[in-house]
Amino acid sequence: MSITRLMRRLKTKAPSPLRSAGALQMAVLILVALGPASAQSITELQRGFERPPDDAKIMMRWWWFGPAVTRAELEREMRLMKEGGIGGFEVQPVYPLLPDDPTRGIKNLPFLSDEFIDALRFVSVKSRELGLRMDLTLGSGWPFGGPYVPISEAAGMLRTERLKLPGNSSHLPIPNLTAGEKLLAVFRARTQGQSIVADSVRELTDIHDGAVWLPENLEGPHEVLFFISSRTGMQVKRPAVGAEGYVLNHLDRVATEHYLNHVGDRLMQAFGSNPPHAVFCDSLEVYNQDWTSDFLEEFKQRRGYDLKPYLPALVADIGPKTLDIRRDWGKTLTELLNQRFLTPLHDWARRNHTLLRMQDYGVPAAALSSNAYIDLPEGEGPQWKILRASRWASSASHLYGHQVTSSETWTWLHSPVFRATPLDMKAEADLHFLEGINQLIGHGWPYTAAGVEYPGWRFYASAVFNEKNPWWIVMPDVALYLQRLSYLLRQGQPANDVALYLPNDDAWAHFTAGNTHMIEILRDRVGPNVVPAILETGNDFDFFDDDALRQVGRVDKDALVLGANHYRVIILPGVERIPPDTLQKFEEFVHNGGTLIATRNIPQLAPGFRATEAEQRQIHDTALQLFAGLSATGHLVRDEKELGTVLNSLLKPDVTFAPASPQIGFIHRKTSDAEIYFVANTSNAPQNVIASFRVQGMQPELWDPFSGRTSRANVRLLTESQTVVGLALEPYGSRVLVFSKRALPKTSPQTGQPAVPAPIDLSTDWRVTFGDNAKPLVMDQLRSWTENEATKYFSGRATYEKEVNLPAGFLPPGITVKLDFGDAKPIPEQPLRSGMQTWLEAPVREAAVVYINDQRVGSVWCPPYSIDVTNVLRPGANRIRTVVANLALNYMSGRPLPDYRLLNLRYGERFQAQDMDKVLAVPAGLLGPIRLLANRSSKP
């Protein structure tokens, strides 16, 4: 049972924050006791892979622009999603794209209005009829906020004013205070250049008549520092009509509950007794939120001392205790987020019988363990060799017992809009799979009002994955590939050997006013070397932190057990501060035979301003015993370039590739009956490797996520400790290998080697019809549509037709024939501002559906650009028909770009369309060469 299911069963009244946290921890402990998901036989696993369940389908973020929506168009788009293999959507109301215009049927329904709620209600009912999952963003745009958030409940910040003290001044005026602001304290400090002299900071308490009064005879240059409890003033980003306003104070429980009562309860009126599957909270982007009005009181209660005299430590170095003070401030920020935002949000979702899906990272400072409050953790970002939100989310799922981890996928994919291809989709999705993701939330599906000029509405900074793309003809096939992998990567349990410790205390210690982005600071603390070293030595890992260790961690023999996961190696990346109980647990782990590695340095400090001398001595002495001297049982790697070598000497890799191929990644899951590996080539070059798997006593099979078929793997060697398999991976190619003990069919003995017929070239004289009603033309040589002025800006589908006469000798027994469209060519990678793209010139631009003798054979949209046609060819005449689709971008490039002047005058500038200078026509069609290629087949 996952925590998701368990939370659905908890129908209690809203508890207090402490009781809620206790109930949550109890739920986590119950899940740990329950252990892994129920056993599944290899036959059942294969059956599910062939026909994966609907809940493994990709979903889409459905942007409702305005929202200028109508029932007819909403239903049409939902039916299109269903036809495209998309399993559901998340409704996100965002900014308008047209002013109200009755002549065009455009009416923007104000957010939370009766008309808007009625549209939601209609979609709720219709989505259930269609079998589509519906999630709902609990607001408009992001972060949470709007006109219902008064300034007193808006996001808080610590405002600091630093003024140089003029010579012979007796006083300075207090800075102007606006609504919601309060002066906390004033300090003076001597300066040296641009820096404050650490031991010179003194509080100024003589404040009256609108000024702070200074002592006489100050020596040297000075600054005066004013600390003000303030508001960020941040407005909701990309709001719908009627959703404009301040961003919510995420560190104020009363403000959170007011928001949920006003917005959440109103939205739930659309659903009645059938709530959405989940409500969604986007990534925490409450920029500069590092304070709340009662922070000083809360800090004193939690940390045991008054922060007020030490406020300058948050902006400057005031001495040896500076980082300890910042650590305490940061820890308090995280605690307040957990208790005042995440707890009431989680409890509200439970009361409304729905799940909480959330991107739980950013600002305010969410920790990895903050995901204990989330039913469905979600990440984003395809960067698989750094600390990124997708692996952050999957690690949380692994620790807290969730089988499903989603990611916001394809954000910024191959900008500009309508430039992304099916291959781009696959390549990025594979990277998310490598990070442990198994539910893709596409970013996204733009609603388009009826009558809007092709190619319709689009989000300002994203790809589009609706039917406006001509390549939509292969969307069901792309979606099925992703669905099969999403299903398979949910089965059993993750099989990661390494646990990578996140030093929260070090991250908090490096917070400064206005810079409290937890995951980014942790990324800097972990550094650029550790994650690649783990992955490139053939291992995989999860992140964890101190609170996760306390909640779900224990030592069992030589393993650190976190939830249902057993880790054989713990890595401490450059850790300076560590809680005594954490280090004590690591000491127990090493004593029982586990492997503990520290990089760069050994921990030396107990965290916090009030850490005692005994605690400091305990950390110092324990760390020395573990990592220093001849009797050290831990391992210190000062130069992280050596980490891979050390790790290899201490842990047999799960998978290795020969030759070494850092561009190849893998993820491993295990069931009671099978070992499941997904392997992906993340590069634009083919990779031919020998893969050695740390699996014994099992037979490997190749499971094809494109077709659902299984076949015997190319086993090179079987030993008592490993299985060696040959893999030939195309550019951006992927494979699934499943190891089990079931007997494989024996290969039939070869009774003779049939002669392989010579290739047949099909690159000339195709009849090509653009669109549905155009007159066919003869293309004597294959060329891009953009080379002809008449089709340069054509976006759509063209049908290529040709008849081929095959001699009887071309199809002898034992021969497999493929229709080959040519090889892809790598192009040099270029730095990108954001997002990703594939770096490949494909021979098919961008997708093709192949028919032989009027029978659909399949589609071609990624390497290898070929398709097996053995069973549909016949001696004599054969009719080949290939429907080819390109990008909507080409049509856009031949038209004026949208003019948002009147829109901006009406509603203000709520977005800026990105990369419009890159809206240029790109090659389209079949570029060839096209051949029929025959090869000997090996059939079992």
Place the predicted regions along the sequence by residue:
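N-terminal secretory signal peptides that target proteins for export/translocation
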Residues: 1-20
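Bacterial N-terminal signal peptides
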Residues: 23-35
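Mature N-terminal segment immediately following signal peptide/propeptide cleavage
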Residues: 41-88
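Carbohydrate-binding surfaces of carbohydrate-active enzymes
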Residues: 58-59, 70, 75, 88, ...
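Acidic/aromatic-lined carbohydrate-recognition and catalytic surfaces
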Residues: 94-207, 215-217, 226-229, 233-237, ...
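An acidic-aromatic loop/edge-strand motif
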Residues: 142-145, 149-150, 156-200, 643-647, ...
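Extended acidic/polar, glycine-enriched regions
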Residues: 184-268, 717-758, 875-877
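Short strand-turn-strand beta-turns centered on an Asx-Gly dipeptide
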Residues: 851-858
